[in-house]
């Protein structure tokens, strides 16, 4: 699922319910100024959590959701100098929490095969129950 818009040479996109990503995904996200990217679950929390087996399999499957780790790896593939805002969203209430998503994504970027580090980009986590701050690009 994705929503994109462009105005005055500012490109932003929302990418949720991905399950996995591939070169097509990277190609469509790589030149953005801002991205809202799902960071749905921590794999360990999901595995030991309350979801029934079939639901765990769906979440982990190709049509499920990106884990924190995959979200970080995808960001490694799309980072560039003009990316001004990264917003992590669509966090599972049962299988994730804000600080874990944030730190895991930052770790993946810092360990990734990219010249960039997490400190080079503003990364925020969308709140589940309140409006996020306005992001000016």
Kindly label every feature range from the protein language model:
Residues 121-137:
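Short, basic/aromatic-enriched C-terminal tail that caps enzymatic domains
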Residues 10, 96, 133-134:
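Short active-site-adjacent helix-start/loop capping segments
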